Amino acid sequence: MYLSTVLFPLLALNLGLSHARFVRETLELTWEYGSPNGGTPREMVFTNGEYPGPDLIFDEDDDVEVLVINNLPFNTTVHWHGLEMRETPEADGVPGLTQTPIEPGATFTYRFRAYPAGTFWYHSHYKGLMQDGQVGAMYIRRKPDALRPYAVITEDPRELAEIQYAEDNPYLMLATDWTYLTSAEYHNIEVESGYNVFCVDSLLINGRGSVYCPGYQYLEEVSDDGLTAVLEGTHLTEKGCLQPDLHNVQGDYGPWNLSAVPTEVVFNCTPSSVEPPVIYVDPEFNGWVSLNFIGGAAQKAITFSVDNHPMWVYEVDGQFVEPREVEMVGVYSGARYAVMIKLDQTPGDYAIRIAVNGGDQVMSVYAILSYVNQDWIHRENVPKAAIGPHTDTVGYMNYGGGNTSADVRQLLFTENLPAFGVPPPPPSSEVSTTLRTGMIRVNNSYSWSLGNNVLYEPEMTSSTPLLFEPDPLAVIAPKYALTTENNTWVDIVLEITADPRDLIHPPHPIHKHGNRAYIIGNGVGKFRWENVSAAEAEVPDLFYVNETAALRDTFVTDFFDSRLMDGAWIVIRYFVQDKFPSILHCHIASHQMGGMALALLDGVDVWDS
């Protein structure tokens, strides 16, 4: 059985209007019982009575006004993930930086320009409410005359028109994760046990996902070979999770209290079932479809594929890229990947597979791509979607997120496709400032620092948002902030610091608010140079300050093992274009709750203006 509601493409065509519209939306937040995965209901956030919140669709440069009504029993905010907010920094939605929290029973109106165009999402930026369901997808259609990258896909005029129609009318695929615990309960288990907890009950796609319990033996059979490196001779739990007391995963920060971790959190698996979302497509109407995946999970990264359908990745983090044809794509929390798919298969149903990517749990969730014109195919020949465990011989990807053949092409989460249609980054000689981070655990297994060994909480300045302070460093200690001057190019070295107590770091998806940044280099070992100019002179092959640079707002570090390396780093480069109280943080919810963030105060030399 599939969902009875047909999920038609987003209904507003790009009419080619050159003037900006004024668009008004209302989001009412409520705290009610729900069960997106068919398991035990728990209290969660609904937006306008829905989970996830409604898709918000705008045209580039629309003037947007969103009234948020907070009927939750908690403070909250809304962050518009990926939007620049250059003209309206007060709308960025970070408590303590751009606003005071929206208190229970209160309202707040966000006003901003819908810019840049592309795939985005919105979510709470207050404590762990994103994990409780305060999320929704957002899409901004490009102007009709925007330069597009599709010539590498096809030169056929009809196909190019169909591709642009698909771009303007995508299916937004919001991937999240779910646990029967509220975010506050989840975090309290970390505090009481001392463990870094990252196990979930299920993945969800557009708010739906079943719980499968195929047994740990099967889960280990389909898991990535790299998982062996962290299991320390143990087995996965029935839930597909790592044992909670693995020394190389938790670091040397004991003692821990295993009794404070309920068995349902990590060990027990209780199956449940909901109908998968169905994406209906009609190749006779339009021969291409765009699926725009949003990494909205609190704890998990994902890999996705569509059975029998190669995909052209054409947009990452809202930015057009040089298209690449693949069968599997890895996505970390905060990132967005749009793929263009040609509808040229036998009419039928095909599984859209979404699996955990990251080596910390083995599980999958499914949606279905359904051709509407199946009637003329003999019933026995109509393809049926193979979903659930033990369907690994079908499609490109197995239940554990691994490929089913060496011929399967995969875009890894560490690969960054070159940006399309934008100038390359400037040479390193034009950079005015080089800033450094130092990612490391502090004091225990669940507290993470982005730099200076500090644990940052945006709420610590909730009553005095830094945007409205003439001297922000008089309100927040300098160790909690990185500062820049206006109209300058800045490099930030995102570096993992090796520590003998802190053996393994998972990949960290570091998200930057405000404008995007170029990824200009990465490497293993310590970043031992004063700046990129010095590093380029010694190891030029590690840098790409040219047209191959990616332009993103989420930057994912590679898997780190201090037993094999003494550091790892990524360098990003961006232009400071105005006063902006930005933030740089890991988008894994438990890491951010554990302190992994720094204020990024741009343009402090013009702050009092």
From Swiss-Prot:
<feature type="domain" description="Plastocyanin-like 2">
    <location>
        <begin position="270"/>
        <end position="372"/>
    </location>
</feature>
<feature type="glycosylation site" description="N-linked (GlcNAc...) asparagine">
    <location>
        <position position="531"/>
    </location>
</feature>
<comment type="function">
    <text>Required for the conversion of the yellow polyketide pigment synthesized by wA to the conidial green pigment.</text>
</comment>
<dbReference type="GO" id="GO:0005576">
    <property type="term" value="C:extracellular region"/>
</dbReference>
<feature type="glycosylation site" description="N-linked (GlcNAc...) asparagine">
    <location>
        <position position="546"/>
    </location>
</feature>
<dbReference type="Pfam" id="PF07732">
    <property type="entry name" value="Cu-oxidase_3"/>
</dbReference>
<feature type="binding site" description="type 3 copper site">
    <location>
        <position position="587"/>
    </location>
    <ligand>
        <name>Cu cation 2</name>
    </ligand>
</feature>
<feature type="glycosylation site" description="N-linked (GlcNAc...) asparagine">
    <location>
        <position position="443"/>
    </location>
</feature>
<feature type="binding site" description="type 1 copper site">
    <location>
        <position position="591"/>
    </location>
    <ligand>
        <name>Cu cation 4</name>
    </ligand>
</feature>
<dbReference type="GO" id="GO:0052716">
    <property type="term" value="F:hydroquinone:oxygen oxidoreductase activity"/>
</dbReference>
<dbReference type="InterPro" id="IPR002355">
    <property type="entry name" value="Cu_oxidase_Cu_BS"/>
</dbReference>
<keyword id="KW-0964">Secreted</keyword>
<dbReference type="GO" id="GO:0030435">
    <property type="term" value="P:sporulation resulting in formation of a cellular spore"/>
</dbReference>
<feature type="glycosylation site" description="N-linked (GlcNAc...) asparagine">
    <location>
        <position position="486"/>
    </location>
</feature>
<dbReference type="GO" id="GO:0043324">
    <property type="term" value="P:pigment metabolic process involved in developmental pigmentation"/>
</dbReference>
<dbReference type="InterPro" id="IPR045087">
    <property type="entry name" value="Cu-oxidase_fam"/>
</dbReference>
<feature type="binding site" description="type 3 copper site">
    <location>
        <position position="81"/>
    </location>
    <ligand>
        <name>Cu cation 2</name>
    </ligand>
</feature>
<feature type="domain" description="Plastocyanin-like 3">
    <location>
        <begin position="463"/>
        <end position="602"/>
    </location>
</feature>
<feature type="domain" description="Plastocyanin-like 1">
    <location>
        <begin position="45"/>
        <end position="141"/>
    </location>
</feature>
<feature type="binding site" description="type 1 copper site">
    <location>
        <position position="508"/>
    </location>
    <ligand>
        <name>Cu cation 4</name>
    </ligand>
</feature>
<keyword id="KW-0749">Sporulation</keyword>
<keyword id="KW-0677">Repeat</keyword>
<dbReference type="GO" id="GO:0005507">
    <property type="term" value="F:copper ion binding"/>
</dbReference>
<keyword id="KW-0479">Metal-binding</keyword>
<feature type="binding site" description="type 3 copper site">
    <location>
        <position position="125"/>
    </location>
    <ligand>
        <name>Cu cation 3</name>
    </ligand>
</feature>
<keyword id="KW-0186">Copper</keyword>
<feature type="binding site" description="type 1 copper site">
    <location>
        <position position="586"/>
    </location>
    <ligand>
        <name>Cu cation 4</name>
    </ligand>
</feature>
<keyword id="KW-0560">Oxidoreductase</keyword>
<dbReference type="Pfam" id="PF00394">
    <property type="entry name" value="Cu-oxidase"/>
</dbReference>
<feature type="signal peptide">
    <location>
        <begin position="1"/>
        <end position="20"/>
    </location>
</feature>
<keyword id="KW-0183">Conidiation</keyword>
<dbReference type="GO" id="GO:0016491">
    <property type="term" value="F:oxidoreductase activity"/>
</dbReference>
<dbReference type="InterPro" id="IPR008972">
    <property type="entry name" value="Cupredoxin"/>
</dbReference>
<dbReference type="InterPro" id="IPR011707">
    <property type="entry name" value="Cu-oxidase-like_N"/>
</dbReference>
<dbReference type="Pfam" id="PF07731">
    <property type="entry name" value="Cu-oxidase_2"/>
</dbReference>
<feature type="binding site" description="type 3 copper site">
    <location>
        <position position="585"/>
    </location>
    <ligand>
        <name>Cu cation 3</name>
    </ligand>
</feature>
<feature type="glycosylation site" description="N-linked (GlcNAc...) asparagine">
    <location>
        <position position="75"/>
    </location>
</feature>
<feature type="binding site" description="type 2 copper site">
    <location>
        <position position="79"/>
    </location>
    <ligand>
        <name>Cu cation 1</name>
    </ligand>
</feature>
<dbReference type="InterPro" id="IPR001117">
    <property type="entry name" value="Cu-oxidase_2nd"/>
</dbReference>
<comment type="similarity">
    <text>Belongs to the multicopper oxidase family.</text>
</comment>
<feature type="binding site" description="type 3 copper site">
    <location>
        <position position="513"/>
    </location>
    <ligand>
        <name>Cu cation 3</name>
    </ligand>
</feature>
<feature type="glycosylation site" description="N-linked (GlcNAc...) asparagine">
    <location>
        <position position="257"/>
    </location>
</feature>
